[in-house]
Amino acid sequence: MNKHNYLLSLVFFSMMVAVGVVISPILRVEGMCPMAHLINITMAVFMGPWYSFLCALAIGLIRMAVMGIPPLALTGAIFGATLSGILYRVSKGKIWAAVLGEIIGTGLIGSVLSYPVMTYLWGRTGLTWMFYVPSFLMGTIIGGSIAYVLLKSMSRSGVLENIQRKLGVQKFVETNE
């Protein structure tokens, strides 16, 4: 990655973190933050799994520090963001795979792992292992649907590939999805 691509990637990453923090309160209820899933999937497609993970981690930590929200901001984001990027890469650029990765990673894995975090570290009582699954799944489906429509339209117009090329990341040309 040359110096220009590195700087552009850093600026894009920073902008996505800022946008993620600012739009996260929109449509948010505890355990359901569709706008975070939109950012996770977008980052996974534009920059890959590790940048997506770091973006979700940064957004979660900032939201916890500034907005005083519980650790659900982390457990509900990092697994989906990472798996979204991995499945996008493994599928050779299928947007539906990135959305599916977010749904599985956050809606199922992250929601189940939120139980011990909230019970033992946060002191919440009366929870079950499946307590967060419905709200996490709904949040990821809503955010994933928005991301799919956005990224699919960008792919059709060629903007997605152009942005990926400018960021210097691995790009894929979608075919027959």
Question: Language-model features: where?
Answer:
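Loop-helix junctions at membrane interfaces
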Residues: 1-177
